[in-house]
From Swiss-Prot:
Belongs to the UPF0173 family. Pfam families: Lactamase_B_2 (PF12706). The keyword Hydrolase applies. One of its GO terms (molecular function) is hydrolase activity. It comes from Methanocaldococcus jannaschii (strain ATCC 43067 / DSM 2661 / JAL-1 / JCM 10045 / NBRC 100440) (Methanococcus jannaschii). It comes from the Archaea. Transmembrane segments: none annotated. Keywords: Hydrolase. This is UPF0173 metal-dependent hydrolase MJ1163.
Amino acid sequence: MITWYGHACFKVDNVLIDPFVPNPLCDLPYDEIMEGVEVIAVTHGHADHLGNAEELAKTYNVPVVTNHEISVYLSERGVCAEGMNIGGTIEINGAKLTMVKAEHSSDISPTISGGVAAGFIINDRVYHAGDTGLFGDMELIGEIYAPQIALLPIGGRYTMGIDEALVAIELIYPEIVIPMHYNTFPLIEVDVNEFVKKAEALGVEVIVPKIGEPLEL
């Protein structure tokens, strides 16, 4: 089951990723978003991804899985946080998460390091790319993990845009692609229908979810 809450925030099975909620695309209540969530995963330290992880983790007594530096930061603030790094795998509360490379920055603030940005393979079938530019080792992610579903940023400016995301699809070659990280703010506004048309021409299924509506995939 996959549910999109705008920007890069998804619920994948029992894992909530990058909990930037509320956001300009989503004003759903916490109780609805956190229903069934047993793990929070954070790809990097920027505010639109670390989001409300601290508040949600404390309120709902849910552990946070993230890179080592962010886990230390959260632990010092009273959060149950599990640190890991790129290439590592953790199994927690019935979820399996493997941290993979991303090309992006990650500072929590100008004075607090957020380690390095990353993506996740969730339960061996979903690839959440995090914030990233295009990089050649996406081909290795496709070869090694063979994700059925890829959640890819398309908004440009701070991540891949549409054209780069299309190349990423050819490197990873998942069965299903779900676009993310677009139209949240004016700087990352794109025509998602353009992406859908071009991606489908590559032979993959593209799904543009409605906010808060679960997809049985």
